[in-house]
Curated annotation (Swiss-Prot):
Gene Ontology biological process terms, A to Z: queuosine biosynthetic process; tRNA wobble guanine modification
GO cellular component: cytoplasm
Main location: cytoplasm
Family: Belongs to the QueA family.
Catalyses which reaction(s): 7-aminomethyl-7-carbaguanosine(34) in tRNA + S-adenosyl-L-methionine = epoxyqueuosine(34) in tRNA + adenine + L-methionine + 2 H(+)
The keyword Disulfide bond is assigned to this record: no
GO molecular function: S-adenosylmethionine:tRNA ribosyltransferase-isomerase activity
Functional description taken from the UniProt entry: Transfers and isomerizes the ribose moiety from AdoMet to the 7-aminomethyl group of 7-deazaguanine (preQ1-tRNA) to give epoxyqueuosine (oQ-tRNA).
EC main group: transferase
Keywords in alphabetical order: Cytoplasm, Queuosine biosynthesis, S-adenosyl-L-methionine, Transferase
Subunit record text: Monomer.
Name assigned to this protein: S-adenosylmethionine:tRNA ribosyltransferase-isomerase
Length: 349
């Protein structure tokens, strides 16, 4: 399939700038691939589609406050630094994106905090906007990380055209987030409230947690018409034996195995055995899922509504079937569903 197959026009007013008042009260589109049907529900109705022994696969990555604002030495020009990943904890080396990139060069010092309590030096250019920074900080590693947390902002996506609020620190995070390392939330999971998870647990639904630290590469636009030539950025992935046991037992019993979000789906599709079971894994994945693709583990998924031409939309097309996905998106726009990170959800059966 070609890139142009994944383009559509989205009215601006359908882009969610704020989350639903309550997590589980966003809307839910339910797509049945067997029956070729589309239904409109509320997210809390998701409980009606799961029974004893079914499995929900959750990505327990935790978003850290990755966006820093500071000033450049001498000129005092305001700059933005987006922390991507830590390269070396002892040397305080980080892979970052900078803005405005043309003004931030090797050797420059950058100052953060009202009292310039954190300083970084640019030591390398990695891409047009990418830099390697060495943070100059005298305290312990723990104090340094606390300082980053204190000065950093919740990295809500740029298309949300408003200032970050204190509420974002809580709402741009799943309630089961544990392992810090993501610069973007696994957004399908944002819809689960404690109450809803408890009700699913009481019903006998099992939860398998995986960790995929979502990077900004997930949202990189695809710029090649031939999808097979697109390269995904690598993201850190951990799948434990415990998670594999829960998933494989459910699979053996022919239960519903539901990937909560594209990140959970990419995680499990990155570590499949020759017998089509889930294997433990610790490392990196740059798996790109686009049509046609045979899914080995999950037979069901929950996801948000994605941007045109995105790799996330391509995965949904591969799982849902392209024609049914197009029909669902057309209906979502007609019915006024909210799109993107803080938007509504779909359940694909």
């Amino acid at each position: 399939m070609k890139l142009s197959h994944f383009n559509f026009n989205l009215p601006k007013e359908l882009l969610a700038e704020f989350p639903a008042e309550n997590r589980d009260e966003s809307r839910l589109m339910v797509i049945d691939r067997q029956k070729n049907t589309i239904e409109h529900k509320m997210f809390k109705d998701v409980i009606n589609y799961f029974d004893d022994g079914d499995v929900l696969i959750l990505n327990n990555t935790k978003v850290f406050p990755a966006r820093l604002y500071g000033n450049k030495e001498k000129t005092g020009a305001r700059i933005e630094v987006f922390l991507l990943r830590e390269l070396n904890s002892e040397q305080r080396l980080w892979d970052v994106l900078v803005d405005p990139a043309r003004k931030i060069r090797i050797g420059n010092k950058l100052y953060f905090g009202d009292d310039d309590s954190l300083v970084a030096e640019v030591i390398d250019n990695t891409t047009s906007r990418g830099r390697t920074l060495r943070f100059l900080y005298d305290g312990s590693y723990e104090e340094f990380r606390n300082k980053l947390t204190e000065l950093g902002e919740t990295p809500i996506p740029k298309y949300i055209n408003r200032d970050v609020t204190p509420e974002d620190a809580e709402r741009y995070q799943t309630i089961y987030a544990k392992e810090e390392g993501a610069v973007a939330a696994p957004t399908a999971g944002l819809h689960f409230s404690k109450h809803l998870l408890k009700k699913l647990e009481i019903k006998g639904v099992n939860f398998a947690e995986v960790t995929l630290h979502v990077g900004l590469g997930t949202f990189n636009p695809v710029e090649v018409e031939d999808l097979s030539k697109h390269k995904m950025d690598s993201e850190e992935l951990i799948i434990t034996q415990e998670a594999c046991d829960i998933v494989n037992e459910g699979k053996a019993k022919k239960k519903r195995i539901c990937a909560v979000g594209t990140t959970s789906m990419r995680a499990i599709e990155s570590s499949v055995s020759s017998a089509n079971t889930l294997n433990p894994y610790e490392g990196w994945t740059n798996k790109f899922i686009f049509p046609p693709h045979d899914f080995s583990i999950a037979n069901c998924m929950i996801t948000n509504f994605h941007t045109p031409k995105s790799t996330l939309l391509m995965m949904i097309s591969a799982f849902c079937g392209h024609d049914l996905m197009k029909k669902a998106y057309e209906e979502a726009i007609k019915e006024g569903y909210k799109f993107y990170s803080y938007g509504d959800a779909m359940l694909i059966l």
